[in-house]
Amino acid sequence: MNKALIVILSTVAIDAIGAGLIFPILPELLIEVTGGGDIGFLYGVMLAVYAVMQFVFSPVLGALSDRFGRRPVLLLSLAGTLLDYLVMAFSPLGWVLVVGRALAGITSANMAVASAYITDITPAEQRAKRFGTVGAVMSLGFIIGPIIGGVMGAWWLRSPFLVAALFNGLNFFIALFVLPESRKSSPGTFAFKELNPLAPLVWLWNFKPLLPLVTVYVVFGLVAAIPGTIWVLYGAERFGWDSVHMGLSLSVFGISGALAQAFLVGPLSRRFGDLGTLMIGVFFDTLAYGSMAFANQSWMGYAVAPLFALGGVAMPALQSLVTSRVSDDQQGQLQGVLASLMSLAGIVAPVLTTAVFFSTKSLWIGTIWLVGAALYLLASPLFATVSAPKTEANDG
């Protein structure tokens, strides 16, 4: 594995760890800075601000990386993330924490640039495997983050942010001296209209051959929000799980998913192609959602982990298919749009998921899982529009 890829993967890991470490300590942190008042509103604002900033700035950073190169945008994002962790570690005021989360949302948009960098340095036939590695690293980061937050937060509430700042600072300096540029900056005069976050979305809308795949991408984001949103609620009501079972089940799912993405995506893609791997993943994910709907014993909740893990091979294959249809000088813009759409799905889907879950559980508690499976089935006609990958440029 080359040095550049290691730096990019460490950036992805630190982003995932940073996103996860705040959740175990955020309620106590808000109680500390507010003096014990009602934290509900401030808690919601901090989560919403993060998601909105990520939605707005993902396409902006992606487009800027197409114009000026990936390296400077990544370095700027890493510096911003370091500043955010320091703000979160020492801020005595609630509104400053909100500003810190806004900054975190902006800098977390560097995932779009990291994905574009991987696309730049990876041959088309190996992209699914590389995106699978990225998914595995993210899964491990989301497991490690809450552990760091919970364990170190018990020692000192702010200490997880200092640890994250340390790792991020080290990554910044390693990237500064080791990370090469993956593409040259584009010629021409910079125009401020390039900072318009809606411009890449307009570009996507005008790029008709890409729309079916991007629609599938959004469906994936909506469906993936179901377990992420209701897993704890469902486990408690359906299986009677306590916090130990919750933590154990999340670890089992995270580790099995990471292993599948790290070790299965490459072989499956070589054997069946990206489209075949996508279909395999959708099949097993649909089977997993259907199985969860009918699971009524605790062990069944664990037994579906391999199905969800196999379902996880679909997203790297889909990312590879999407990148193969866009020219090299538009990969940053593409990844920015994809990240922005996933952020939007992350804002909307939890609201819809909880609404469906609570409105249907009195009829049948497993309904929400069948809704996820049904979304895959409704999207299946779009797969018929997907042909063999071809790189295509579009100036919009």
Regions found by a protein language model. Give the residues of each.
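Multi-pass alpha-helical transporter architecture, strongest
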Residues: 3, 172-178, 370-396
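Short amphipathic helix-loop junctions that connect adjacent transmembrane helices
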Residues: 25-40, 229-246
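Conserved MFS/SLC helix-loop-helix module at the cytosolic interface between two early adjacent transmembrane helices
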Residues: 55-93
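Structural signature of the two symmetry-related core transmembrane helices
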Residues: 72-87, 165, 276-291
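Cytoplasmic helix-loop-helix junction between adjacent transmembrane helices
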Residues: 99-139
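A membrane-interface helix-boundary motif in multi-pass transporters
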Residues: 153-166, 355-376
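Juxtamembrane intracellular "pre-TM" segments in multi-pass secondary transporters
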Residues: 180-215, 238
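C-terminal transmembrane helical hairpin of 12-TM major facilitator-type secondary transporters
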Residues: 275-318
